[in-house]
Structures are given as structure tokens and as C-alpha cells.
């Protein structure tokens, strides 16, 4: 193969790799930090709505809570169980807690 052919092949492979990377749908994220309340429920609902509208492949929730209202916690659990996309909850960063989760 000539140098020109090798260079052209390299550029084609690079373009294909970049195209494949940009084609993947995004992963949405939301951070919940504090007491679980009706405001937290609304935050989760908005994050799910946005993630689904953006055609995200998943929603990642970063959670750090001492707990909160049982009614809000149960409503959040129902929303997550009925979500149209996968939801991943990460208790973090290190030292974080999830008392009502």
C-alpha cells in the first residue's frame, strides 16, 4: 500500500470512530442532596421528563440524604419503577448516606 492509501484508510477509520462515539445517546444526571421532600419528588420528576425528552439512555441519580418524608420517598420510588428509561442511583460521594432509600 502506498503512503497515501494508508493515510486515507487511517482518516476513514478515525472518522468512523468519531461518528460512532457521537451517535451514542446521552446519560442524564441529577444530584439529590438533603432531606427527601415534595421538592425532591418534583426534582426527580423533572429529571425523568428531561431525560426522556432528550432520549437519554439512562438517568443517573447521585444521592446523599439523611432521609425525609415517607410519602415523598414512596412517590419517588413509584416514579423510578415506572420510568421509561433505566434509572441508576449512586449513593455518593464517599461518606454519603441514603437513610430512606
Q: What is each stretch, according to the model?
A:
Residues 1-2:
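N-terminal secretory signal peptides that target proteins for export/translocation
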Residues 18-101:
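Soluble extramembrane regions of membrane proteins in the secretory/endomembrane system
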Amino acid at each position: 500500500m502506498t503512503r497515501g492509501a494508508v493515510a486515507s484508510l487511517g482518516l476513514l477509520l478515525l472518522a468512523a470512530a468519531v461518528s460512532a462515539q457521537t451517535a451514542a445517546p446521552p446519560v442524564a444526571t441529577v444530584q439529590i442532596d438533603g432531606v427527601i421532600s415534595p421538592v425532591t419528588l418534583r426534582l426527580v420528576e423533572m429529571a425523568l421528563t428531561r431525560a426522556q425528552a432528550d432520549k437519554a439512555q439512562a438517568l443517573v441519580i447521585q444521592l446523599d440524604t439523611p432521609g425525609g418524608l415517607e410519602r415523598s420517598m414512596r412517590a419517588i420510588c413509584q416514579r423510578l419503577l415506572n420510568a421509561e428509561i433505566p434509572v441508576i442511583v449512586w449513593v455518593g460521594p464517599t461518606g454519603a448516606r441514603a437513610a430512606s432509600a
